[in-house]
């Protein structure tokens, strides 16, 4: 089953969820605000996608961090610690496409998702 990780009020997550619904894709939504960031999943994402892609330096949460907190996130270990503490710095959505589907995607790209589903 497809699992979408993010926060429900994020515009990109809203678009992604609406798109999946329109495409008839069954998915489960994991709300970072209510359920937190599963450390073992984050470790998998870091291995698969890399911390540079996962760390959203363009978002409001990042901009609100003081420079000391931002400096901590200059390597994989520091970025991981920050992501566990401040889930909103994770680029969204993170989507696990299920076993055998080729790992994860970070962010929403309808064209890439269409191709991933074999519909493009």
Name each region found by the language model.
Residues 32-120:
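Thiol/selenol-based redox catalytic cores and closely related redox-interacting motifs
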